[in-house]
UniProtKB/Swiss-Prot annotation:
Pfam families: SNO. L-glutamine binds at residues 48-50, 101, 127-128. Belongs to the glutaminase PdxT/SNO family. It catalyses: aldehydo-D-ribose 5-phosphate + D-glyceraldehyde 3-phosphate + L-glutamine = pyridoxal 5'-phosphate + L-glutamate + phosphate + 3 H2O + H(+); L-glutamine + H2O = L-glutamate + NH4(+). This is Pyridoxal 5'-phosphate synthase subunit PdxT. SUPFAM superfamilies: Class I glutamine amidotransferase-like (SSF52317). HAMAP family: PdxT (MF_01615). Catalyzes the hydrolysis of glutamine to glutamate and ammonia as part of the biosynthesis of pyridoxal 5'-phosphate. The resulting ammonia molecule is channeled to the active site of PdxS. Pathway: Cofactor biosynthesis; pyridoxal 5'-phosphate biosynthesis.
Amino acid sequence: MSVSVGVLAIQGGFQKHAEMLESLGVEVKLVKFTNDFDEIDRLIIPGGESTALLNLLTKHQIFDKLQDFCSQNPVFGTCAGSIILSKGSQYLSLIDLEVERNGYGRQVDSFVTNLGFMGNSIKAVFIRAPKFTRVGDNIDVLAKFDDLPVLVRQGNILVSSFHPELTEDSSVHKYFLNM
């Protein structure tokens, strides 16, 4: 069975996710309209600017369709995508996670570090990254930085505060594809 992965493509860094998935031989659909959800099995919500993304979701009238899709299918949110999916936000509230926007600093504070993930070391790029300030009891913490979670999963939802698509390492995307 082939899997078709959608990448929400109305704002933010969607192209790098699409390129990473294509390098893995995955069929990619750039999601811009409500009917695009009918053609995909799972979805990536990329980084970008969460307030701008919310405004565009509302303007393009896809917020409700996005919420419905994300509640039933595997979804991966990176950076702003994690904010959109988190509880305590005015967004989708689909994962028991609270975040602090720009918790790791402003653009000038961006950094690259190595993280432990599934027994291996992966590179992680943090750009105006959210800090995960509270994780629910039913959350699986998959990677930490400075003893704080930065990659977590709850059921069908995977979120990272960093940008795995900006590295050569496809481990996190492969994990998502196997959820």
